[in-house]
């Protein structure tokens, strides 16, 4: 069963290698990413992803992103899609 929700990503320290690796992960999960908004700030960046997929697939995305040292990830899933 699919859910729709938001994944919040906060990058606390810019590290080119980590950011490139994060982009690869996002590409791997592009099938569940409906929208993306990034807010660049000095010293910190925030990205909001709108996602639609199974809980398992969304959890796999947040799990991979959460392994990066300078990236914090939280998700909120709200609606069950039929």
Describe every region a protein language model picked out.
Residues 1-82:
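Long, contiguous binding/interaction regions
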């Amino acid at each position: 069963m699919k859910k729709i929700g938001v994944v919040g990503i906060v990058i606390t320290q810019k590290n080119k290698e980590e950011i490139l690796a994060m982009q690869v992960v996002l590409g791997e999960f592009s099938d569940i990413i409906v929208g993306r908004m990034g807010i660049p700030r000095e010293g910190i960046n925030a990205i909001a992803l709108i996602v639609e997929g199974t809980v398992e697939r969304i959890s796999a995305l947040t799990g991979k992103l959460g392994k990066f040292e300078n990236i914090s990830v939280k998700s909120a899933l709200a609606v069950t899609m039929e």
